[in-house]
């Protein structure tokens, strides 16, 4: 599977599946989830929350509505209770779950944000390392392209350096 890193707004990406950085309730609030919710139009938040709550590390799939994708895979790296903080295990499990869901749907391309960072509180560089390690180790059936995405210039530079070490 080709593994690249890109910079930009995940809601503007084109792929078979876009991964949402979700909490266990699957409610689409701010950050990556907010960007996807606003760009998708339609009842994506309602569809997502109807599939939750899910266990930490699990993923659920919705339609992508107006996004340039077929599906949004909502990967729960953050609990919506307690301290609401992501962990190494939750980031790894959510990344694997997202890739497996996209693969099971027959997707060939997927865009994955650095799960567990931002409002979920995990340090970006370490989170990027965990996500990149899981993407690099994944043995796909249908997926042929995975892009890990960062929004800001500084996060992209960090992601690029991490991916170069991991690949």
Language model: regions and residue ranges:
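Glycine-/small-residue-enriched capping loops at alpha/beta junctions
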Residues: 1-88, 92-104
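Phosphate/ribose-phosphate-bearing ligand recognition and processing surfaces
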Residues: 79-167
């Amino acid at each position: 599977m080709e593994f690249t890193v890109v910079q930009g707004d995940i809601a503007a990406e084109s792929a078979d599946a876009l991964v949402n950085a979700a909490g266990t309730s699957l409610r689409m609030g701010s950050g990556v989830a907010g960007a996807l919710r606003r760009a998708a139009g339609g009842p994506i938040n309602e569809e997502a929350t109807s599939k939750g709550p899910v266990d930490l590390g699990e993923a659920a799939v919705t339609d992508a509505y107006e996004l340039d994708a077929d599906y949004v895979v909502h990967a729960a790296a953050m609990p919506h209770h307690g301290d609401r903080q992501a962990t190494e295990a939750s980031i790894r499990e959510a990344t694997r779950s997202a890739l497996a869901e996209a693969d099971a749907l027959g997707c060939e391309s997927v865009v994955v944000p650095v799960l567990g960072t931002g409002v979920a509180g995990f340090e970006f560089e370490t989170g990027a390392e965990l996500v990149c390690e899981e993407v690099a180790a994944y043995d796909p059936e249908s997926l042929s392209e995975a892009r890990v995405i960062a929004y800001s210039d500084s996060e992209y530079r960090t992601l690029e350096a991490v991916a170069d070490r991991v690949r």
